[in-house]
Amino acid sequence: MNPAIWRMGKISGAMTMPDCFRWRYGSKALEVLVAVICIVFLLPWMQMQFAGLATILRYIGWDISYTVGIGISAAIAYLYIAVAGIRAPAWISIMKDILMMAAIVSGGLVAIHNMPGGISGIFDMAIAHFPDKVVIDAEPITKNATFVFSTIIFQALGFCVTPLQYQFIFTAKSEDTIRRNQIIMPLYMFMYPFLIVAAYFVLVTVPNLNDPDSSFMALTAANLPEWTVGMVAAGGALTCILVIAVSALNLGGIFSRNIWGVFRSSVSQKQAVLVTNMTTGASLLISVVLAVMLPNLMLGVINIAYFWATQCFPMALATFFWRGATRTGVFAGLLTGVVAVVVLTETHVTFWGLNQGFVAMTLNALVMVAVCLCTNPDEATNETSNALFAYAAQEEPEAADL
């Protein structure tokens, strides 16, 4: 799907995720709905990074309070994006990835080395003391395996359509660059076995750990030299700052272009930049307040936010690959999914143990297809559809040169 996103961004000149769907369907209502979903996703996502950064600061010996640490982090993130913009974070992400990969692999190897019996010893102890955290019970299957596998599928689809994903794709130089990155992406899975081993090692060696989110830092602090702990902390801190910076910049652009701009008859470049900067700063401030004042409430909000963001997947799939998609159909489907998420999570209703977001997305897709089949694309939608599919049909060398 990533090359299709890049093609649409190239043709339409889109700068944000809602821009794509405004261009494709010419619907301001759809644009605003997608923008609201993006903002609801990005705010708790930023708050989660602040919480992670606060955990890192506790392990590097900074004698500052949780609140002060988060405030300093917000100031650094704002200065960072004000100076560097979006492309510099894309470059620095390479350094972040190298540091994080090295840290996770090192942590996993240390866990294997320090446990008698290595990997088998770690899992033998985990099964003996925490069997419920190692094995998924077969019965009742609707409350265990069905939920786990539907959640895996749902999250995998959601990763394709987050607003951050669109932002990173738009900054790529060409469609070939996107394809090369997709070839490399599976290599990131290399670190997960080491991360799992490290997590279970901490589970069996530090059973009374108060904050499970700090398990990896606890492992490195207890088993690695100080300079290595510093490297791990640097990788984690850089990751948090990078995500905060890109998220805030993305949120500012979405608000100024796809919400504030929609309700203004004319917007100058100077006004748009001012609103973007103000919104970026406000989003950092709101995330800091949420991280400090309402950390427990945000756990539920993060869940709903991800459920909402993933509701964009059926619409995106239809937008890029189905000529018969109509503005009425995709809007009806997306709205159905958003409402279904709220109803299912608030009432705690489940169907066969499936992930509630997955159920909502299924309803979303069914409504979208049904309405699209009952309606016809208008002339403007047909024009954008023809332009998109004509561009995709070009020969590879020509497409790469554009």
Model-predicted segments: where are they?
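Membrane-embedded helix-loop-helix hairpins and adjacent transmembrane boundary segments
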Residues: 1-402
